[in-house]
């Protein structure tokens, strides 16, 4: 399978998705194309977000979002809740780019886990990409978060080369501290 993240925003034409799903069907015998609507999480609290989720329900699209600190925890939780409820309603998967940061370690995953717990939803397939700021937490904190993630069946995709390029980079020196998801610790927690 090839998963592609398509930048998505309010007011964007639905036509792009119709064309992408035509391509998906055209090549389905040779290749599985997975499309993620990568949007600000507040997008899923709009009529455009609801309409796109409906279209995705019959085409296998994936709801996507970006959660990177600093952010307003209350608003982020509200928008994540809407996204989770849409995914539950339309039987969709979620793909989040989360904690791709060198500040506020684990802030995004903590809000996600708290929101899932408050909604009492456990059956939504969720993939979290990056999680690079977790490396700044203590080993115990990583293992505790990992256990909660495993309990909710949250999958993690580490993107070390992307994070090496995006985070803590300087034109004058090579940083000795480049955050990357703590995969070994998360694996100990069965993530």
What residues fall within each predicted segment?
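Active-site-adjacent C-terminal substructures of enzyme catalytic domains
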Residues: 117-191
């Amino acid at each position: 399978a090839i998963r592609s993240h398509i930048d998505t925003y309010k007011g964007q034409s639905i036509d792009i998705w119709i064309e992408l799903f035509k391509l998906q069907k055209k090549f389905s015998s040779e290749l599985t194309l997975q499309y993620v609507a990568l949007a600000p999480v507040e997008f899923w609290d709009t009529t455009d977000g609801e309409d796109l989720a409906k279209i995705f329900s019959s085409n296998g699209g994936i709801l996507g979002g970006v959660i990177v600190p600093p952010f307003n925890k209350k608003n982020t939780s509200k928008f994540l809740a809407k996204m989770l409820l849409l995914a539950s309603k339309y039987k969709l998967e979620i793909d989040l780019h989360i904690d791709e940061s060198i500040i506020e370690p684990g802030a995004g995953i903590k809000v996600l886990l708290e929101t899932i717990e408050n909604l009492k939803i456990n059956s939504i397939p969720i993939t979290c990409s990056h999680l690079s700021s977790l490396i700044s937490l203590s080993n115990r904190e990583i293992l505790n978060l990992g256990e909660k993630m495993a309990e909710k069946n949250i999958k993690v995709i580490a993107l070390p080369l992307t994070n090496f390029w995006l985070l803590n980079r300087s034109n004058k020196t090579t940083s000795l501290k480049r955050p990357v998801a703590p995969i070994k610790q998360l694996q100990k927690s069965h993530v």
